[in-house]
């Protein structure tokens, strides 16, 4: 039997406008939303008393994501149940059609506690300790890397086995490079606060075009699923970009655990429907459900930084690249002189 918890949040409308006339009506609604939160394995419960048919709607990201029709009940309040498991996580608004001034705002959290994973080091490869790594991705057996900082930002192609540069270009001094990803034989490289993305030919490194970000605040990490791109901006949002529409930001998912939102998602990597993400100033990798935004697991890398040469410019973990043939992850950090090939222990 499901426990029904009355909410302190309710609608009580005694008058409303319809066809420019004021009609006396009463709509009473109570929900099981507690502390403005529900989890995605909960069932939204509405206790409704209305003398007319109603349509409840749920909005997310300014888009309509659910329609909940309710039949009138003349004398008694009735309960209605709606499952939430197919919705994305994050901030939602529940309202009655034609009564958008009356809203229940709530946050949908994940029902799962993130699982903690350890790792095993398979190999270590030397590299320059001057690489301020912002993005990392394999194309076949070749590693591509985006290096940051004003006046030092680069796009490089690397033989990871010996650290030799196979190609490189220096960005203008007023651009701070961030994440990169490869799709349709093009390299997409983000900038930080400049709010533009750069598009290069994969083979020649010739710049083809650029694009504006839209509503995202900054450029942090980026990855792709072969069709769409997924871009972080330092907030809890990961934006979904359409390469067929000049990388237009079509939508976003919000990243949450079972308790709260997660911000500062940095370098991203797409593997088998999951987004693997560094989090700025945290020594680990979040495993994100790309459909709903739930953090399903965390790879604990807390002692990895100790295994590189310690120096005054040594910075945070940042850089995830998945090698599809080797079925392993390559991880590194800003100003690290090593890149580690690791296996996730599940």
Q: Which residue ranges define each predicted feature?
A:
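Bacterial signal peptide processing site
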Residues: 18-21
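Blade-loop segments of beta-propeller domains
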Residues: 163-200, 206-216
């Amino acid at each position: 039997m499901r426990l029904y918890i009355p909410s302190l949040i309710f609608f009580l409308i005694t008058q409303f406008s319809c066809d420019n006339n004021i009609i006396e009506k009463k709509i009473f609604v109570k929900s099981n939303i507690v502390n403005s939160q529900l989890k995605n394995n909960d069932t939204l419960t509405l206790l409704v008393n209305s003398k007319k048919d109603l349509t409840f709607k749920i909005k997310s990201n300014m888009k309509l994501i659910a329609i909940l029709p309710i039949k009138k009940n003349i004398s008694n309040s009735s309960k209605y149940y709606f499952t939430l498991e197919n919705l994305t996580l994050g901030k939602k608004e529940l309202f009655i059609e034609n009564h958008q001034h009356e809203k229940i705002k709530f946050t949908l959290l994940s029902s799962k506690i993130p699982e903690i994973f350890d790792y095993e080091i398979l190999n270590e490869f030397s590299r320059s300790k001057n690489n301020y790594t912002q993005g990392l991705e394999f194309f076949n057996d070749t590693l591509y890397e985006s290096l940051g900082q004003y006046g030092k930002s680069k796009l490089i192609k690397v033989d990871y086995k010996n650290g030799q540069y196979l190609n490189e270009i220096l960005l203008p001094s007023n651009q701070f490079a961030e994440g990169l990803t490869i799709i349709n034989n093009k390299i997409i490289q983000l900038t930080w606060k400049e709010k533009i993305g750069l598009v290069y030919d994969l083979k020649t490194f010739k710049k083809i075009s650029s694009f504006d970000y839209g509503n995202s605040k900054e450029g942090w990490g980026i990855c792709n699923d072969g069709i769409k791109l997924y871009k972080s901006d330092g907030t809890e949002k990961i934006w979904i970009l359409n390469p067929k529409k000049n990388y237009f930001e079509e939508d976003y998912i919000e990243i949450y655990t079972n308790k709260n939102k997660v911000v500062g998602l940095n370098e991203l990597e797409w593997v088998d429907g999951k987004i693997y993400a560094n989090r700025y100033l945290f020594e680990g990798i979040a495993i994100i459900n790309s459909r709903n935004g739930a953090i399903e697991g965390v790879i604990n890398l807390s002692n990895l930084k100790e295994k590189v040469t310690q120096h005054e410019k040594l910075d945070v973990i940042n850089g995830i690249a998945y090698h599809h043939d080797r079925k392993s992850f390559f991880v590194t950090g800003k100003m690290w002189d090593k890149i580690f090939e690791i296996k996730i222990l599940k």
